[in-house]
Amino acid sequence: MTIYDQILANKTAGRKMFALLIDPEKCSEEWLCQVMSTVNSQQSTDNSQLFIFVGGSQLKESVFDIVEKIKRMTTVPVVMFPGDASQFAENADALLFLSLVSGRNAKYLIEQHIEASRAIKSSGVECISTGYILVDGGKLTAVERVSHTSPYPTTNPQLIADTALASQLLGHKMVYLEAGSGANRPVPQNIISETRKAIDIPLIVGGGIKTPQQMMDAFSAGADLIVVGNHIESHPDTLASLLNQL
């Protein structure tokens, strides 16, 4: 079963999913051991609801080594969450092939994809095309700075939902609503709900989620998979309480 098939099966069965986002430039050996221990102690028998995302907006080093290290520590699937074409590791289980559909910067709509396409195809790594939509999280985020694009305002849920639908019609397999790393607030429930009603494909939501209640609010609004990263970087002891919500 592919990673995408696994996600679809969970969505169809109503099983919610969680991804821990690891930024290789921000994780120490001690932190990684701690969070992997928590993940392994919480995981279900088949790991089907858990994922490790690896990536960041400003990575400068190769991610191959960190992916290899994580895969030695857990059987949970490792999925690349790349900020650009250089952030590709052929030892990952899958790759989110992100297109920044909320922006109009061609570099992140298609140019980075062209640059990485041959390496991805030759590697054989599963590639999951994903429409990536930035939503205002109340502060300037790294992805805004790097991509030179602005997030959609939370006052226009229809625009966000329509963009998600356009993404689906373009052939993207998933939609990712992103408030940004370290956002002051997560993606609002009404935006998640409107987007969920507009699309049939899996819906990922990340950015600004810090508590089990915020996670459950996103799930109840229609998110299929929640991504948490920045908060766990500074509060690794809270990971178990989030995983317990699955």
Question: In which residue ranges do the predicted regions lie?
Answer:
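Hydrophobic faces of well-ordered beta-strands that scaffold small-molecule active sites
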Residues: 16-22, 52-54, 78-80, 95-97, ...
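Alpha-helix-loop-beta-strand connector modules within alpha/beta enzyme cores
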Residues: 63-84, 116-128, 185-211, 241-246
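Glycine-rich phosphate-binding active-site loops on the catalytic face of alpha/beta enzymes
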Residues: 53-59, 94, 98-109, 179-182, ...
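Catalytic cores of alpha/beta
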Residues: 80, 84-97, 198-228
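N-terminal small/glycine-rich loop or linker at the start of catalytic domains
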Residues: 5-25, 126-151, 188-197
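Alpha-helical segments flanking ligand/cofactor-binding loops in enzyme cores
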Residues: 68, 165, 193, 216-217
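Conserved N-terminal beta1-alpha1 strand-loop-helix module at the mouth
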Residues: 1-76, 148-174
